[in-house]
Structures are given as C-alpha cells and as structure tokens.
Amino acid sequence: MELKHFIHELCLNPRHTKWIAPLLVIGDAFLCALIIWKIPYTEIDWTTYMQQIALYISGERDYTLIKGSTGPLVYPAAHVYSYMALYHLTDEGRDILFGQILFAVLYLVTLAVVMVCYRQSGAPPYLFPLLVLSKRLHSVFVLRLFNDGLAVCAMWIAILLFQNKKWTAGVTAWTVGVGIKMTLLLLAPAIAVVTVLSLSLVPSIRLGILALLIQVLLAIPFLQGNPIGYVARAFELTRQFMFKWTVNWRFVGEDLFLSKQFSLALLGLHIFLLGLFVTTGWLRPSGSNVPDFLRSLLQGRQRTVVLSKSFIMTVMLTSLAIGLLCARSLHYQFFAYLSWATPCLLWRARLHPILIYAIWALQEWAWNVYPSTNASSSVVVFSLAVQVFGVLLNSRNALSDAPPRRKGKEHIQ
C-alpha cells in the first residue's frame, strides 16, 4: 500500500518536478551527445543557409538575389543574423560537428525553459518524460540544424515571460522569433487576448506597434535594398507547397490538396475555431460575454484581470495547435513547435494519463513515417484535432486556474 501511495505521489504531485526536471535535462544531454556521436548528420538546408549567408556577407541586400543550392532565401531578417553568427562560429559552415553541438545546447536550453513553463503551470510529473523522448524533435535540432529550433526557443522564452507578466520582454522575444520564421505568427491571436485582458486595449496596441517596429529595425538593410522583394520573400503568405512533402493532408489526395477551395476552407476553419475559443473560453476571465467585453473595451471601461500562468500557457499553445491543425501543409521540421505543446494540451483536455501517452506515441509515430502515407497523415491530423477539440470541449476546466481533475482521482498539490 505504501509503494502504491509513493508511486501515486511521484507521478501526480507537482512538487516532485523540481528534482525530476533537472534529472531529465541531464539525461537528455547524454542522449544528445550519443545521437551526435552515433547517428550521421543529415544534409538538408544547412549548406544552402551558409551559401545564402556568404552572399549577405559579400554585400548582397536584395532578398530576391540571395539564393542557395536548394532555393532562395525565404525567411525573415533575424534568420539571416542568427545563421551569420553560426557561419562565423562553424568556420563558414564547414565545422558541422561544432554546429551540431551548438544546436544540442540550444535544444537543452529550450527544454529547460519548457520545463519551467510546465512547472509554473502546475503540470504533474508524469508529463515530463514526454518532453525528452521525441525522436523527431532531436532530429530537427541536432541532425538537421533547422532554423525552427531557434524560433521554438524564442517561442518558449516568450511564453515564460508572458507567464511572469513581463509583457514587453515577452513581445520582444516573440517578434524576434517571428523574424526567424513566421510560423510564430500563429501565436498572435493568443498574445492579443492575454495582453488585452491583462493590460487593456491601448497598452496592447503599443505592444503590437513595438513588435512591428522591431521587425522593421531587423529588416532595415534589406528594406533599403529592395523593400517589396524583402516582404514578398520573407513573409510570403501565398506560397504553394508541394504535395510530396506534406505530413498532414496527404490523405485528401493531391487534387484537393492543391485546390484553392481547400485552402480557403482551412482558412475559414482557422478563423472559426479562433472565434469559438474566444467566445467560449479565452474571454472567460473578464467575466463578461463578447458584446459586453467589446463595448467596455471600446469605451475604455474594461477592467483588467490577473491571468494565471496555466491560463496563459494553455491559450498560447491552443492558438498554436489551431494554426497547425488548419495549416495546408506541415513539413517534418514543424514538429518542433508541436512536440513540447502536446503533453500540456492533452493534460488540459483532462485525458487519462494512459490516453495521453497513447496519443503522444501515435503522434510521434506519424511524424517519423517518411515519406508520409495516408495513414500517417490521418494520425497527424487526428492527434492535432484531439488536442484542439479536447481543450475546447473541456474549456471550463482547461482554462481554469486549477489543475485538471479526473473523475475519482485528484491531483495532489
């Protein structure tokens, strides 16, 4: 009986995460070293990044003329500056081993930040092993050296800062992340909601202006060279994705995947889901319905509220998951954004721990199938749908201050 109580306590009591988390990070550091030692580096975009940076260093500032062996430069300015630093640190990209070590450090730093966010949200210890077990996530960071690792680090730093009400610093970290890869724009609706609830309308607008100004400052060298070319390349929202690389919607068939109607349907679903979350859960801390909230907001009578750390993290990750669910094409590196979000979202959806582990494992399997199949892509969409609709259907509990409870069981505080 005492053993059963000890295991129950160890798995469910959040206070144990203060020693479980550091042990997992240390263990993962050894795992990263083993991966770098035993598994060959995979060349995908690193050489192209370095070729593009070489052109930038040589003086080229026209984004439309910065290209590499696998294509043109399609990421914003902060990506260029980040990889310029890596260019110099890795002997112009030739010392790939050192680059892998740097990305392993980046991975571990991000993991530590993620675990702090989880601890501040009161997450139970049984979730934490899921944060270090992903094969695909390790691959994205230490075997492929994708820029998504840098963007994900900025995203989680921003979430941590938002949890601690460091709004200006949080927006700065987030917009720098957007400047690396615009995938982080998926968090914009959540940031708007939490800042308006916490600060009211005018301070939120100021933060939005700050984010925009930082983007302009980062882009000045390129805006002086070819402003239209920079915006069109770095923030291209109409890019056509190739069906053969898609991880999520392969099962719908190529004709439907490439159709404009499908793209518009996903956009409509994205907007609908965001609106549904706003009306059913995200505005609940204000204590008013949407019309009353908007009326008070526009009249300057809105009362600010103190948001819990768990609420802020859940809203941020839900906004991300909605965007990924409604994205027309996800590539393998996009798993970097989702992997660390999934355990939290499944937990906030009040799923049983066994079910959480099962869905996590299914999702991990699907993202490791290469090339994707109808079955794997169906699982990718299904697992995302479980996370989004699980939180939606349990929004009263998922977006509350208290940890989720399962019937007949209680998380020990």
UniProtKB/Swiss-Prot annotation:
Superkingdom, taxonomy of origin: Eukaryota
Keywords: Endoplasmic reticulum, Glycosyltransferase, Membrane, Transferase, Transmembrane, Transmembrane helix
Pfam families: ALG3
Enzyme class, spelled out: transferase
Positions in the Cytoplasmic compartment: 40-95, 161-181, 229-261, 326-372
Membrane topology field: Multi-pass membrane protein
InterPro entries named in the record: Glycosyltransferase_ALG3 (IPR007873)
Signal sequence interval, chain numbering: none
An MF annotation (GO) of this entry: dol-P-Man:Man(5)GlcNAc(2)-PP-Dol alpha-1,3-mannosyltransferase activity
Membrane-spanning intervals of the chain: 19-39, 96-116, 140-160, 182-202, 208-228, 262-282, 305-325, 373-393
Pathway as given in its UniProt record: Protein modification; protein glycosylation
GO biological process entries: dolichol-linked oligosaccharide biosynthetic process
Keyword Endoplasmic reticulum set for record: yes
Substrates-to-products reaction catalysed: an alpha-D-Man-(1->2)-alpha-D-Man-(1->2)-alpha-D-Man-(1->3)-[alpha-D-Man-(1->6)]-beta-D-Man-(1->4)-beta-D-GlcNAc-(1->4)-alpha-D-GlcNAc-diphospho-di-trans,poly-cis-dolichol + a di-trans,poly-cis-dolichyl beta-D-mannosyl phosphate = an alpha-D-Man-(1->2)-alpha-D-Man-(1->2)-alpha-D-Man-(1->3)-[alpha-D-Man-(1->3)-alpha-D-Man-(1->6)]-beta-D-Man-(1->4)-beta-D-GlcNAc-(1->4)-alpha-D-GlcNAc-diphospho-di-trans,poly-cis-dolichol + a di-trans,poly-cis-dolichyl phosphate + H(+)
Enzyme Commission (EC) number: 2.4.1.258
Residue intervals on the Lumenal side: 1-18, 117-139, 203-207, 283-304, 394-413
Entry function: Dol-P-Man:Man(5)GlcNAc(2)-PP-Dol alpha-1,3-mannosyltransferase that operates in the biosynthetic pathway of dolichol-linked oligosaccharides, the glycan precursors employed in protein asparagine (N)-glycosylation. The assembly of dolichol-linked oligosaccharides begins on the cytosolic side of the endoplasmic reticulum membrane and finishes in its lumen. The sequential addition of sugars to dolichol pyrophosphate produces dolichol-linked oligosaccharides containing fourteen sugars, including two GlcNAcs, nine mannoses and three glucoses.
Family according to the record: Belongs to the glycosyltransferase ALG3 family.
Name of the featured protein: Dol-P-Man:Man(5)GlcNAc(2)-PP-Dol alpha-1,3-mannosyltransferase
Organism per entry: Aspergillus oryzae (strain ATCC 42149 / RIB 40) (Yellow koji mold)
